[in-house]
């Protein structure tokens, strides 16, 4: 490969202090001569050094006879028969003694793959693009050659006050910046290393720079602040490192990074480390790096998940995610550790706060202080709380054992991130579970994720109330079994008395209270997942009713049977069974109870369901509601134009992002008129004229429908509107089926 070119070997061999490094370099050259590195192994100056190619160019591959390929005379520092470990030993690479000593004191005695791949081209002065995953030793990969150069260049400069930095390391987050600073300080305590980032005192960092510094590590935003304030001078920077460059893009630092690069000396050496190569990173390398060598230890292989991870995917609306999240954790984590991944810091805070009412949780993101971060991680590891809500950036590099459940609250940016997130569970051969939340507009992305990762999701519905109660009880029982016997003896008297009084109900009451269900749980819609709503299924036998069965038929049925139900009906979806005419829809719990007790027209069956049947999905590819995307407020405060309570024409407010897709075939236009196709979306406000056999419908701002002109009320709502639709028994207009003279 290009990293092992003869100029690199010449540089290494010309350094009288690099005895061990000369041996390693000469060994690589000899391996090439023996044919181990064929045509692609040593290539053009900007060729790619891959993991596979590097394995063929190991710095110390044993021969079968136990003797190295050069014999015993290759170098005085080389001993025949020594294997890879000895050749890659830190002590044998010609590094300064003080650097070797500090590394060995930290237990670092050998190079990792990324470190051995970077070492020679970095010492050669090449610009580099290195692809390596998080946690593979990238910091020392660029740290070792830079520290070596700084120490060997020292002419008393290191102790000079007011010196400007020779090394600049840019990191996307303060967590990573502090980690890099720690690595460099521990490896080279003699060098002046300063870490700068936002959220802390500007003056403290300014004073540290004014005293003189060799290495500056920081986030782009604070670096620019210090440059603009005249506190940071970059005119003598010799080495630039962009660590996790792809994450710079993810957190919005691309413009800041380019601003900084434009102010650096042209003759600097630049090293860019990135797990992925988005277009911005490629553009950056073309513009600001000089004929860079690419070292790729990731490759183009598909990301794969560890075996033993069960994958689920659940379709939700944006607003229903938080409602369903706690139930998913209760049912699938079974009291174990859960990590919920969000994209933004704001989401992490809000999700954690929403969970706190039912499940102990903490947030982890870049705005949290280092002290709080460590406190949070220790508490999670020790089981003081069971749910950690984290952003991708804040969670990079974390090592937390025994995580039972991963929830992707938002879709990851790429397959690698999905694998990285999900890989937090199912470690060391243990079983684990990962659940992906997605909206209807993200279905294609989910399919692409399955293809790219090579996995298959099991698509699930939100847990039912019964499943949540059962799982909660099991968790409480497991907790009770862990109570120390010495503690229970103080409560035996009260327990016996209560058991005599209530029998098994005493224990049941205790389980309910400890599970957080002192009051009966309210119903929840299977469609919108909102509490206080019930999902019903209407089935009509063949031969009953007129025309095609459609959501319009459902609204007509409800208008004739119960005007209050028609006035409050939510979204309507047709079932997918071709042999049965059916639909599902939402109603407020109290209205649904009354409707289920009413007499229905012949051939119609109405039931409360606990699981959605297969539904027709022939709606538009988008789930935008057009003009209705922003005009729906809280459902409890909504009012129809006719004055009655309404669910916003069957739509659901989803924060303007991913709106729950209508079951119909067309979107509403930006006017107040409705077409027949609009009716197929279902859930329209029922202060309108409609019935089973009706051929026309019009939107009315009048009051709620009445039965044959009679005044009726439900829940305090008055209905005094005359009926102008058509009877579904005889098809004639002007009366309802309940008033039909032919019934």
UniProtKB/Swiss-Prot annotation:
PROSITE patterns, per the entry: HELICASE_ATP_BIND_1, HELICASE_CTER, Q_MOTIF, ZF_CCHC
SUPFAM superfamilies on file: P-loop containing nucleoside triphosphate hydrolases, Retrovirus zinc finger-like domains
Transit peptide: 1-37
Changes seen on gene knockout: Very pale yellow green leaf phenotype. Virescent leaf phenotype.
Keywords, ordered alphabetically: ATP-binding, Chloroplast, Helicase, Hydrolase, Metal-binding, Nucleotide-binding, Plastid, Ribosome biogenesis, RNA-binding, Transit peptide, Zinc, Zinc-finger
Residue sites binding ATP per the record: 132-139
UniProt KW Chloroplast keyword: yes
GO biological process, one term: Group II intron splicing
Domain Helicase C-terminal: 324-469
Intervals of motif Q motif: 88-116
Top enzyme class: hydrolase
Cellular component per GO, a single term: chloroplast stroma
Regions of compositional bias (Gly residues) in chain numbering: 642-653
Family membership noted in the UniProt record: Belongs to the DEAD box helicase family. DDX21/DDX50 subfamily.
Role noted for this protein: Nuclear genome-encoded factor involved in ribosome biogenesis in chloroplasts. Binds specific group II introns in chloroplasts and facilitates their splicing. Is required for rRNA maturation in plastids and may contribute to the assembly of the large (50S) ribosomal subunit. Required for normal development of chloroplasts.
The protein, known as: DEAD-box ATP-dependent RNA helicase 3B, chloroplastic
